Amino acid sequence: MYSTECTILLIEIIFYFLAAIILYDMLHKMANSPLLCIAVLTVTLAVTSKCYAQNYGINVPITGSMDVAVPNKTDDQIGLSSTLCIYYPKEAATQMNDAEWKSTVTQLLLAKGWPTTSVYLNEYADLQSFSNDPQLNCDYNIILAKYDQNETLDMSELAELLLYEWLCNPMDVTLYYYQQTSESNKWIAMGSDCTIKVCPLNTQTLGIGCKTTDVSTFEELTTTEKLAIIDVVDGVNHKANYTISTCTIKNCIRLDPRENVAIIQVGGPEIIDISEDPMVVPHVQRATRINWKKWWQIFYTVVDYINTIIQAMSKRSRSLNTSAYYFRV
């Protein structure tokens, strides 16, 4: 950086030195030749008058007021340099029962500025398995999550899991006690049946309100859930208990937000709003809800508002194996 600045400074010094020599030579000649003096003054006055004249442009018609905000057209071309992934449940394709539905959706997105080669429609079997290995590989990722009251899956916890990066380590509760050290430190449990019980311990490793040798005295935090983000009192050791054959639990640290991921809840009585959750950073705007209709109507709505959704997101700025976030050790 410094070598470039020195080079520019040297060029400027040489330029001004040469300009001074030329000016001195011209003044010397003008002093000896009145005709040359008159010619130089005439050219100077002619050029100066053009510099201060009003420039109306050439062949540029002016209509209406010039005090108009000009929109930034570069935003309209975002699809030309970005990839878009839309993740949908298997039941969507089953209900639409149309072999050409993907082609139809991509053609509709083309009208919104997204080339067909930049759009990927990815199917997942169920939310629990998808959240376990999400494969969020596009510049922009939109997840359609259908609400099901019969599913033992908390949509707000699913949103928190997918909208943030996590660094996790496996927990061996048969050998060790565990404690959470900060607000961003959580335990994430996944499986077909996660019933988590804990017993808080004092400094002598004796149970607080429970017996470490009697699981029935443990405090039950979750019951038969498929996904649970568990928050206990920071700085206190806990002895945990769960059924290893139907559930896994990991000690995780919540990292930065995945700003290139958005979740759309399809149906359900409430809108996903994890900003109300004290466990997460507030003001998350990348989660919303669409009233449940037919899946064709859902996709039409997504296509119609695709660029509005994208504006609430940020393009992926670095290479990251997002699918491995839950299994990193």
Swiss-Prot record:
User: Which InterPro entries does the record associate with it?
Assistant: VP7 (IPR001963), VP7_1 (IPR042207), VP7_2 (IPR042210)
A Gene Ontology cellular component where this protein is annotated is:
host cell endoplasmic reticulum lumen
Write out the PTM section of this UniProt entry: N-glycosylated. The N-terminus is blocked possibly by pyroglutamic acid.
Other notes on this protein? Some rotavirus strains are neuraminidase-sensitive and require sialic acid to attach to the cell surface. Some rotavirus strains are integrin-dependent. Some rotavirus strains depend on ganglioside for their entry into the host cell. Hsp70 also seems to be involved in the entry of some strains.
Question: What intrachain disulfides are recorded?
Answer: C85-C138, C168-C252, C194-C247, C199-C210
Compartment(s) where it occurs, according to its Swiss-Prot or TrEMBL record: Virion; Host endoplasmic reticulum lumen
According to the entry, what is the taxonomic lineage of the organism? Viruses, Riboviria, Orthornavirae, Duplornaviricota, Resentoviricetes
Subunit comment? Homotrimer; disulfide-linked. 2 Ca(2+) ions bound at each subunit interface in the trimer hold the trimer together. Interacts with the intermediate capsid protein VP6. Interacts with the outer capsid protein VP5*.
What protein am I looking at? Outer capsid glycoprotein VP7
Residues the entry annotates as binding Ca(2+) 2: Q180, D231, V232, D234, D304
State a single Pfam family of this protein: VP7
Q: Where are the transmembrane segments?
A: none
**Keywords for this protein:** Calcium, Capsid protein, Disulfide bond, Glycoprotein, Host endoplasmic reticulum, Host-virus interaction, Metal-binding, Outer capsid protein, Signal, T=13 icosahedral capsid protein, Virion
Enumerate the glycosylated residues: N72, N150, N241, N321
Residues binding Ca(2+) 1, per UniProt: D98, G209, T217, E219
Report the HAMAP family cross-referenced here.
Answer: Rota_VP7 (MF_04130), Rota_VP7_A (MF_04131)
Region annotation (CNP motif) maps to: 168-170
Gene Ontology MF term list: metal ion binding
**Record's superkingdom?**
Viruses
Its biological purpose: Calcium-binding protein that interacts with rotavirus cell receptors once the initial attachment by VP4 has been achieved. Rotavirus attachment and entry into the host cell probably involves multiple sequential contacts between the outer capsid proteins VP4 and VP7, and the cell receptors. Following entry into the host cell, low intracellular or intravesicular Ca(2+) concentration probably causes the calcium-stabilized VP7 trimers to dissociate from the virion. This step is probably necessary for the membrane-disrupting entry step and the release of VP4, which is locked onto the virion by VP7.
Residues making up the signal peptide according to the UniProt record: 1-53
Q: Which family does it belong to?
A: Belongs to the rotavirus VP7 family.
